[in-house]
Amino acid sequence: QLNATTYGERIKNEIASGIEITDALKQILISENGEINQFDTIAENLMSASIESVQLAPDGVVTDIYPAEGNEAGKIDLIHDKDRGEISCYARDNHTIITQGPFELKQGDYGIAVRNPVYLTDTNKQEYFWGFTIVILRVPDIFSDSIYALSNFGYEYRISKTASPWSDTYKVVYQSDGSLTQPVSYDFKIGAENWRFEITPQSGWRNNTLIAVVTGFFL
């Protein structure tokens, strides 16, 4: 169980590092009363190898995407979109980050969308919904360090998340090629969704020594 917790926390933190980009944009919007000047420059500085794109969606409509090239189809009305509308409205109405996916990106890669709702205050001190700051995380790139270590140490693993905030059904985000026999798991929450990380040695659980030894490398 310790080993699942150790890796599970690492994976959670790797995903959180991507989500921090939406928080950074959110703070700029709040401080600048809903405006971001030089969005492309800011987004470029926030990008990393595990990020597919950074987006702004005032009133829930995606208007700005970095990088713009190849992402023109991403400019959609999230609130009224048949695949994204319900979960986007949930994020807006419940003041919570949502993660949706994985879904196929261009070149056959996969991604997870993180939508972070932003609220501003009008002249009457009334809060209103500005829109979303968004980042598309590449899968499995966002947790590549963890899965590289897992593979090196001879583990099979599975990362999954609930399909939506109101669902108990888990959807696989990424998994190793082999089967999982009697896996131990670690559950964690990101935004409004529950995530689960499962792990088992490729050779099976012989004894507790293996768990203790491998855990020691990451404490």
Model segments located where?
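Serine/threonine-rich low-complexity intrinsically disordered regions
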Residues: T6-Y7, D122-N124, D177, G204-N208
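Broad hydrophobic/π-residue packing in well-ordered secondary structure
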Residues: G8, G18, I42, E193-W195, ...
